[in-house]
Amino acid sequence: MTQLPGLLDTEAIRKDFPILDRQLHDGRKLVYLDNAATSQKPRQVLDALSEYYERHNANVHRGVHVLAEEATALYEGARDKVAAFINAPSRDEVIFTKNASESLNLVANMLGWADEPYRVDHETEIVITEMEHHSNIVPWQLLAQRTGAKLKWFGLTDDGRLDLSNIDEIITEKTKIVSFVLVSNILGTVNPVEAIVRRAQEVGALVCIDASQAAPHMPLDVQALQADFVAFTGHKMCAPTGIGVLWGRQELLEDLPPFLGGGEMIETVSMSSSTYAPAPHKFEAGTPPVAQAVGMGAAIDYLSAIGMDKILAHEHAITEYAVKRLSEVPDLRIIGPATAEERGAAISFVLGDIHPHDVGQVLDEQGIAVRVGHHCARPVCLRYGIPATTRASFYLYSTPAEIDALVDGLEHVRNFFG
């Protein structure tokens, strides 16, 4: 068995994830390498969900009965856990959403309806990058179409990194918001946050960071990032689906208008007007994802007990080993950084002339789960002249043996189509 420095005790960790014991085609054991799409859930999270539904299920806030008070305490307790996990200065800066896409749409719409000095209009500019997930492209396209603002973006270098050579021309005095991904979901690139934030601050632009591929894998400190907004999702970090987070600076959340209206987000309502509750409730209209938030709190407890630094070290070792092994496969081309340095735990590649969907299907027959397609990042595929990629992505329970299984599987793919 391959031994790598920095690995976690995956034998013990994998016992917490019941699904990893599944056997698929012809009794083949599941090799789950699709963690950038969603992670598997540990028993501790599953138990927390069952406990909530079996003992505490009620709608939150305003209720005076025992179940409502218990549900509210669990829901707001999850907010406290998120705030501590990302080192937020205040729990009131943590907004629960249904996913990162909703978080990013929330920012775009807040700015679209805002008063000065935050309002995006026809005289202002929005900056994104060519490596964004569609969830950090389409909301800004919609905002630009609605307001007349100009949408600009950073391009990509041949090795899958942001081209910041023209940063002063892209981010200008007209820029209202710069929104970019911390870790690319398709390229795996870890972006140079400090340089982008510094330039944005020079011109007085706001900064929004999509941390969906960062929060599950590395320590996330919103104060150190010096951003104005940070968005991420729960289902990629051992939490259930249906729960996301938007962190925003307190003074911004106080000044910016709500996007969705309804129950809970109000202070007073009359037939002629309404006033709004303080943040974060101003941005959480209607019944929130209570059970999902409880599950996210349990996921944070689980990850924190292991340690995000240790998870990062484990994944770096796995990614480094994967880059090495994949580089040995004939006709395989990694899309993105060719080394594990400044790279997250996802590797996209093409295998000769074999279509990625064919690669994925043959791998699936061997029990190996990868993701194929453009990964909701089609501009990246257009940039590199490819229709799609195969993506293998790793997490705290990934093992060197699974990388070996992937490489063996790819050899089988080559022989199958050879």
Task: Briefly describe each language-model feature range.
Residues 1-418:
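Pyridoxal 5′-phosphate
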